[in-house]
Amino acid sequence: MYDVSELHAARQQLHTLNLEQQAMLDNDMIGIAKVKDRVIVWRNPALERIFGYAPGTLQGRLTEEMYVDREDFLAFGRDAYAVLATGQHYRQQRRMRKVTGEIVWIDVNGVLLQGQGESLWLMQDITAMKQYQEQVEHIAFHDALTQLPNRLLLADRMTQAFALSDRTQTQVAVCYFDLNGFKPINDRYGHDMGDEVLKITGRRLLEQVRGNDTAARIGGDEFVLLLTAVKDPAEVDQALCRVMAAIEQPIDLGGGRVVRVSAAVGTALYPRDGTTSFELLRAADQAMYADKGHVSVERSL
């Protein structure tokens, strides 16, 4: 004979399990897809919402539609299915494409369904998280006022430039700038106007460098230009002439207030003057102070 109470309890547990499974499948945050031959044979509503498809329209489609381009689709297939074939899970954070063409970041987690020739994939939109990470990284490595690279990012760029220099037998120039005439402007017109002068100066520096060079603000009214792959020191002189001419252009602060600044500059070359970022910055800083003293003597005369 059957125990009716046990049978009822078993049915209740099964019903609860079905509800839990359905809740998981209907989860609005995690998209789920069953894929065979890279065609979606089943999906939950969340997957269509994540990728912007109308309800019921994603099933039966080739997954290629969800990738940035065909090359990305093929590369993912090679990498992911090679891992799945070993019986392991495959997980990656990657850029994918919504039906509108918008690019989003997706956390992709897949497993092979044994004996079915199918794979099961969980996908979650992590675009907001990625954007937040990028903002945090930007804040950590950029000057808040000018948005130029700060000392930390400059040091990293210098390390990369030194490695390139070693491979290509070229030089790296570190040019250290200190503005002349900034303090009187700051004292007379206030910090807001002083900040505007620094921002304009930063933009002018950035406009004068090549794409593989770096303009950085490392504090106060001090800036650094990192010039990479220098074959002839004359290239540095030519670049500095352009930069100094740009810095010395009048700055219109509005309300009839037009100011000018100039700069003292010191240059150090890798590997001639040092082989580390600390040594090169120190050498360029010392050369800058020598130049600043020379400028001061000229003005007093």
Please give the residue ranges for each predicted region.
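PAS-family sensory domains
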Residues: M1-D3, Y67, Q116-T127, A283
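Sensory-domain boundary/capping and coupling elements
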Residues: H8-A23, K130-H142, L148, L152-T159
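PAS/PAS-like sensory domain cap-loop motif
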Residues: L47-Q59, V68-R70
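Per-ARNT-Sim (PAS) sensory domains and their PAS-associated C-terminal
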Residues: A85-I106, G117, R257-V259
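Short loop/turn elements at sensory-signaling interfaces that couple input to output
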Residues: V108-L120, R272-T276
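Conserved long alpha-helical elements within nucleotide-processing catalytic cores of c-di-GMP signaling
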Residues: E137-F141, L148-A173, N180-R210, A216-G220, ...
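Catalytic-core segments of nucleotide cyclases and related cyclic-nucleotide turnover enzymes
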Residues: H191, L240-C241, G255-G256, L269-S300
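Catalytic core regions of nucleotide second-messenger enzymes
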Residues: A216-I218, P233, I247-A264, D273, ...
